[in-house]
Design a protein with these regions (language model features):
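Polar low-complexity intrinsically disordered regions
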Residues: 1-2, 99-100, 160-161
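Short glycine- and acidic-rich boundary segments immediately preceding or forming the N-terminal edge
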Residues: 1-11
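Core catalytic region of metal-dependent phosphoesterases/phosphodiesterases
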Residues: 9-20, 24, 29-141
Length: 171
């Protein structure tokens, strides 16, 4: 399987007939109400059948920053409580996702991360993807806020016939 990023909003995935994918969105991974046990169960089921993982957007909730009007200290996981909230969230996410990094192909942006980027001049999705790739050697791509995932499916039994599927993603 080969993934390529064309610009900020187009990701191409060359795969084979029969390849499987787990498509996720709005994980809000750092929120206390994120059911990580259920998420882990779904991820491990996907990995057991050889599926790759794509995350559409809002990977993080990340709404508890200093300048967020929606912030509530009750909505911070204990491991993220500290003066370096953003760093704690990203570092803990990288640690949790490291064992799945080779199965993760793509992480898109959402309104939560983009709001933080505007207020704090920090791109937490990019930071997460870059740090995960650095620590694990994976090749996870980050996408735009909305865009296209283009699947090109080769069919070995038919030798030259390929199918192309274009999937729009947005929040």
């Amino acid at each position: 399987m080969e993934t390529t990023k064309y610009g900020r909003n187009i990701v191409s995935i060359k795969c084979t007939d029969g390849d499987q994918f787990l498509l996720l969105s709005d994980l809000h991974f750092d929120h206390p109400k994120c059911r990580r046990d259920l998420l882990q169960e779904h991820i491990e089921k996907a990995i057991n059948v050889g599926a790759k993982i794509l995350i559409n957007g809002d990977f993080f909730c990340i709404m508890q920053g200093k300048y967020d009007k929606r912030a509530s200290k009750d909505d911070i996981r204990p491991e993220h409580q500290g003066g370096n909230y953003f760093d704690l969230v990203v570092n803990e996410a990288v640690e949790w996702w490291a064992k799945y990094a080779d199965h993760l192909l793509f992480v898109g942006y959402g309104n939560h991360g983009t709001a933080v980027s505007k207020r704090h001049e920090i791109d937490l999705t990019e930071r997460f993807v870059s740090l995960l790739n650095y620590k694990t050697g994976a090749k996870v791509l980050n996408g735009g806020y909305a865009g296209w995932i283009v699947f090109t499916v080769s069919r070995p039994r038919w030798s030259v016939i390929n199918s192309r599927w274009k999937v729009a993603y947005a929040l």
